[in-house]
């Protein structure tokens, strides 16, 4: 048995007589291992995909309505609408608006759900508990955060979509140049915007 293994190893080493053949051999080994992993975990992959398909989605046709509502009733500086998938931990910026209008330059960025930023993680837990975390925004937590600061945001609030702790399919972040004078009214307007994004028009 040992001699057979040594014989096979000798044949492989004899075959690898150039850097190209070595690279090809390593590549084949990596692909074979990757294929094995996918095959071995196929039930997990299929299960995750099926669960993702069951998740409700934000009402894409009403995103502009929600943003317009927030600019009109809260005098917002920025409005950012994210699609969230808690199963795989993604939070992707779907739409970004400033007072000048929609800004596509930052759309599509995945800032992740939980990160190495403690303040962000605290807010995410609050969102999952159906709270509306608000506070000063002094330093960026992500690439999108740099955009917030560039647009003049110094104070912000977040709300989950829908405003219901049993589901978490999206997030709205709203920012202002200074803290709103009536924060309770502002939070009510965020709840309305979140409800708008939870269902399509009939």
Regions found by a protein language model. Give the residues of each.
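Intrinsically disordered, low-complexity terminal regulatory regions
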Residues: 2-101, 202
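Juxtadomain coupling helices with adjacent low-complexity linkers
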Residues: 45-51, 60, 64, 170-202
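Short, flexible beta-strand-to-coil junctions
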Residues: 84-86, 162-164, 175-179
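A short, aliphatic-rich beta-strand micro-motif
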Residues: 154-163
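Regulatory sensory and allosteric helical modules in signal-transduction proteins
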Residues: 97-151
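Short, solvent-exposed loop/turn segments that connect beta-strands within catalytic domains
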Residues: 87-92, 102-108, 164-168
